[in-house]
Amino acid sequence: MLQPMWVLSDSDLATIHSATVELLKSTGIQFLSEESIELFRHHGFRVEGETVFFTEEDIDSALKLCPPSFTIHARNPERSVEIGGRRPIFSPIYGAPYVVDFEGNIRSGTLEDYQTLVRLAHQLPNQDMVGYLLCDPGDVPAGKAHVHMLHASMTCSDKPFMGSSTHGSRGVEDCMRMGEIFFDSSRAYLREHPFCISLINSLTPLRYEKGSCEALMAFARDRQPLLIASRVTGGATGPITMAGVLVLQNAEILAGIVLAQLVSPGTPVVYGCASGIMDMRSIVVSLGAPEFSKILRAGVQLGHHYGLPCRGGGSLTESCDIDAQAGFESMSTMLNAMAYGADFIQHSAGCLSSYLAASFSKLVMDDGICSYGKAMREKVDFSEEALAIDIIKEVGHGGEYLTHLHTAMNCRSAVWQPAYSYRGGLNAWEASGKPDIREAIRERGKQLLAEYVQPDLEPRIRERLEAFVLAYKA
C-alpha cells in the first residue's frame, strides 16, 4: 500500500487545532436535544441554553477513547470489513432523491429502484458495502421507509450495510431489532460484534439537530460505529476560504465525537470529511472542483493526526449524465480520496448532479474507477519472479517477450484489466461500429442484474424480517 500524500505541515495542523479549540471554547456548539444537553451538564460542561462549550481537555479525553480501527461484521463473515485498516472501504451513493435508470430516465426513487441499486452494489466486485439510503424510496410512507431500506440491505445482499440514522432514536431501535433477527442473536452480541455504521451529520454551522443527537446517542449506547460528519459549504454555510471551512468542519466533528464518548466510552467513530464549496454563479455545490479535493486532503490528514479513521468521498460530479465531465471529475475525486489515505469512502459509486441522483450506469462506471484506484495503490512486486533477471538475460539484445512463457504465465496478474473500457485500437473500433463506452457500461450493468442470485438466508429469518416490516406502524 502506498503512503498517503500529506498537504498540511505540522505548523498548519497546530494552527487549525488551536483555532478549533478557540471556537469550541468561546462560541460552542448548539445541541437541539434536551437529552444531549443534560448529559453534557451532568459531566460538568459549561452549558448556556442549547449551547455547549468545550475545553481542549474535553477534546483530548474523548479522542483518547476512540479506537484507531474497527470491524463491521457481515452475516457472511467473508464480507466483513475493517475500517481504519490497510485499505479504503467503498460504500455507494447516499441520500439521492432521484434515480436515473439504464435508459436515462430521471424520476423520483421507488422501493424497486432501491432494491435494484442494492443488487447492483452486491454484484459489483469493488463495492465493499451496500450502504443505506441509496435513493429515497418515495412510494413507501416516509415513517417506515427506513425499515424497507434495511430489509432490502439484509435480504438482497450479504455485504455489510449502513444503519438507519434518519429517524432519530426510533430508527436506531428498529435497526437494532432487525439486526437481532438478521443475525439471529442478542443485543449483547451485536454490541460486541458491530454490524452497521451510521452517518451522523451536523447541522452546519455549529449545530446538531434533535434527530441526529438522538440517533448518535442511541447507536453509541448499542456500541455501533458512527460516521460523524460535517458538510460545510464554503460561501453558503461556512466561510468561503479553505482554512475557515477546515476549522468549522473540525469543530463540529470533534463536538460530535465528544458526545459519543460521553454516552459510551470507546464507541468507534470515523472522522467525516464531507465539506466543499459553492459555485457562486450557479449556487450549486461544486464537488468536482479542486477546492473540494484540497479540503478533503487536509481534512483526512487532520483526522489521522487525531488517530482516527477518516471518511472521504467518492466518485463525485456535478454532471447530470454519463459524460466526459462525469468521468474526469469522478476519477479525480476518487483517486484524490485514495491517495490522501481516506479509510471509508462514501459515495464511492453512483452519484450524479452533486448528490441529487443515483444512476444505475454511474454505479457501474464508478466501480471501475474504484478498481483502477486499488490497482494504483498496490506496491510494485520486487520478488525474484517479478524482477525477471534470468528472463531478460535469456531474451537478450533485440529479442521479444510476446511469445515467452514468462509473459503467458504472468499476463493475467501483472496487468490491470478494465471491466468495460475499450482497448482495441482505432481501426478495430471503427470497424466494429464505433462502440460507445456508455453503452458498454449499460450492458455490463444489465448483465450483472441478469446474473444476480439472491444470497442464501434461512427461511425463518427471512420470514421474521418480512413480518417485522409488514407489522411496522409508521
Q: Where on the chain are the PLM-derived regions?
A:
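Short beta-alpha connecting loops at secondary-structure transitions
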Residues: L2-M5, S282-L287, S315-C320, G350-K362
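Catalytic-core signal marking the mid-to-C-terminal active-site face
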Residues: P4-A19, T27, L32-R41, S361-A474
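N-terminal glycine-rich anion-binding loops that anchor highly charged ligand groups
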Residues: S11-I16, G28-H43, E48-E50, P88-S91, ...
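Flexible, glycine/charged-enriched surface loops at secondary-structure junctions
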Residues: Q30-I37, E48-E50, D128, Y189-E192, ...
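Glycine-rich, N-terminal phosphate-binding loop and its surrounding beta-alpha-beta segment
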Residues: E38-N105
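Helix-rich catalytic cores of soluble enzyme domains
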Residues: G109-A339, D343
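Glycine-rich phosphate-binding active-site loops on the catalytic face of alpha/beta enzymes
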Residues: L335-A357
